[in-house]
Amino acid sequence: VRSSAASDVYKRQIGIMLGHFLPGMKEALNHLEYAGISIPMAVLIWIMIYPMMMKVDFKSIKNIGKNPKGLFVTWIVNWLIKPFTMYGIASFFFFVVFKTWITPDFATEYLAGAVLLGAAPCTAMVFVWSTLTKGNPAYTVVQVASNDIIILFAFVPIVKFLLGVSNVSVPFQTLFMSVVLFVVIPLAAGIITRLLVVRKKGTEYFEQTFLHKFDSATTVGLLLTLILIFMFQGEVVLDNPLHIILIAVPLIIQTFFIFFLAFGVCRIIRLPYDIAAPAGMIGASNFFELAVAVAVALFGTSSPAALATTVGVLTEVPVMLTLVKIANKLKEKFKYE
């Protein structure tokens, strides 16, 4: 654990140094985006989730209706609990615990950024966390796809209700591109690859040999993703060290709380581990591309609200990797008699 934590610190330091000392490289990569989505980040996410998508068997997708409890847990936690606990936890810390260091105006915008993060469950990275916890690939795809559909009609009303902001709108281009880039394209590529390899060399070769060629893809992709995030956001960290820490506290507490809530409920209702782990991960992680896009549109690029969503990006990978370790250690608890 110590070596892993040290490794994470080194990756962050490398990213910050690259962004600081090679601003030209950072600027070039920053320009490679479409609809608010970073193309380099998209490529790295593809590298991480493509192996999982190859494991998706459409026959198993048809059988998900026989065990819908995992979907119900995901929907209830993500939409009826998570946005409101985020509002409560963030309000308590920004307006009460940290009032000595954060002015009311800043606290209000930090709260807005936190709520934007809490109101949209993750799309792309859930596939990575599911892979690392050996989650059910087909079930994870349905969990993510169904939540993306709910975002279309639930995100705006929830944000308006919690923040009292009237001019909230979903950047549909960002949402659409995220679904296409992180669900449709890798899923199609994975299924086509599976069909072609199985047809040519058989199921045994595909499962025992071919899939293992991609065993290190997720690890390499995660390492590069962490470096890239801290390269993009390095200046933010260096310019606002205290506020970064203060914003991170409620975000991290919320992440752990939502994970253990969903994961624990799955244990109580006796769901298998490969459904429970992704159910906990999808609620714990956030759709930060969407949150950042809305924060920038509502409050501006250099606003405290945008900074809060950026902190969500910074904390996402290290915190979720910790939850992956915890989930894997608790796997034995999901063996029922």
Which residues are covered by each model-predicted region?
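Hydrophobic transmembrane alpha-helices of secondary-active transporters
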Residues: 15-20, 38-65, 83, 91, ...
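Structural signature of hydrophobic alpha-helical transmembrane segments
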Residues: 35-49, 105-120, 175-188, 243-255, ...
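Membrane-embedded alpha-helical segments of transport systems
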Residues: 76-85, 117-125, 139-160, 180-186, ...
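Interfacial helix-loop-helix linkers and transmembrane-helix boundary segments
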Residues: 28-34, 54-74, 133, 170, ...
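Membrane-water interface at loop-to-transmembrane-helix junctions
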Residues: 7, 170-182, 204-225, 233, ...
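The feature identifies polytopic integral membrane transport proteins across all domains of life
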Residues: 67-75, 96-117, 135-145, 205, ...
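Entry/N-cap segments of selected transmembrane alpha helices
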Residues: 60-90, 94, 175-179, 232-262, ...
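Single conserved hydrophobic/aromatic residue that forms the stacking wall/gate
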Residues: 1-6, 10
